[in-house]
């Protein structure tokens, strides 16, 4: 099994694209509008895993995403932490995550939790 992508339906399309592109450093991929009520954009990490953002223009409220977490590893963990502090998006400060990793959590514009993980 190979997990290919995670889909997030958003009411904050532009802010979400900026977060995944500029903060997480994901590469923009396919982007299209299958109809007049929807825009879709994909963002890919260095291993090929993708986040699919769907903006349904008919949807005005986001659903509860507090129980969703996306885990990401960063070689320059300190740089990501400083950028997250600057943006004011930290949900939880760095803490040990198991015996070998450190982790802090940020919120994307949709309220999805993104774990920023550094191997010890």
Label each region the model flagged.
Residues 40, 50, 71, 103-105:
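Short hydrophobic/aromatic beta-strand element in the GNAT-like acyltransferase core
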Residues 48-51, 62, 111-114:
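Short, charged/polar, Gly/Pro-enriched secondary-structure boundary elements
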Residues 46-50, 58-60, 77-78:
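Short, charged/polar surface micro-motifs in flexible loops or helix N-caps
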Residues 7-48:
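Core segments of cupin and vicinal oxygen chelate
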Residues 19, 78-83:
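Short amphipathic alpha-helices within nucleic acid-binding modules
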Residues 1-17, 68-72, 120:
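N-terminal beta-strand motif that seeds the catalytic metal site of vicinal oxygen chelate
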Residues 1-2, 62-67, 97-98:
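Short glycine-enriched loop/turn motifs at secondary-structure junctions
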Residues 31, 42, 81-120:
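Vicinal oxygen chelate
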């Amino acid at each position: 099994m190979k997990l290919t992508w995670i889909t997030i339906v958003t009411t904050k399309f532009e802010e979400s694209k900026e977060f995944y592109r500029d903060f997480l450093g994901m590469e923009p991929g396919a982007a299209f509008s299958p109809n007049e009520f929807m825009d879709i954009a994909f963002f890919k990490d260095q291993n090929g895993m993708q986040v699919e953002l769907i903006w349904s223009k008919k949807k005005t409220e986001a659903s509860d995403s507090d129980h969703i977490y996306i885990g990401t590893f960063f070689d320059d963990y300190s740089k990501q932490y400083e950028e997250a502090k600057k943006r004011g998006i930290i949900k939880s400060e760095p803490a040990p995550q198991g015996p070998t990793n450190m982790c802090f959590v940020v919120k994307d514009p949709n309220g999805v939790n993104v774990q920023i993980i550094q191997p010890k």
